[in-house]
Regions:
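Contiguous alpha-helical scaffold segments within structured protein domains
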Residues: 1-44, 114
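Glycine-rich, small/acidic residue-mixed loop/short-helix segments
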Residues: 29-116
Length: 116
């Protein structure tokens, strides 16, 4: 099974604008790595595609801010469906295992649209 943590965050500055809070939290270390600036440089150098909505926020502002990071997503376009999911790569990662985990993560999305 794949497990993720859920973390509730409450700002010290209760009156801070929601966009400032999201900006301070993005990208999360779980997505980008840490320290953030060097990690983002590596991602920009290695990844040859636009992440689109993947790893961005989906937020609702209804008297408060409710946001989630889009980890498993799909986007429709005229050319087809793009599925997004990822995993943490470390020095001990086994490439085939990482690939299989990613396939497992998007299997529910594929099933939802009957994609084979």
């Amino acid at each position: 099974p794949v497990e993720h943590l859920l973390t509730w965050v409450e700002p010290d500055a209760a009156n801070a604008p929601a966009v400032d809070i999201l900006e301070a939290l993005h990208p999360t270390p779980a997505i980008c790595g840490t320290p953030t600036a060097p990690a983002r440089e590596v991602i920009a150098a290695v990844e040859q595609y636009d992440r689109g909505l993947y790893t961005g926020y989906l937020a609702f502002m209804t008297g408060g801010l409710h946001a989630t990071v889009l980890l498993r997503t799909m986007q429709w376009s005229e050319s087809g469906i793009t599925f997004y999911a990822g995993g943490g790569i470390t020095k001990d990662s086994v490439p085939l295992n990482e690939w299989m985990e990613t396939e497992y993560k998007i299997s529910a999305l594929k099933d939802a649209v009957q994609f084979k």
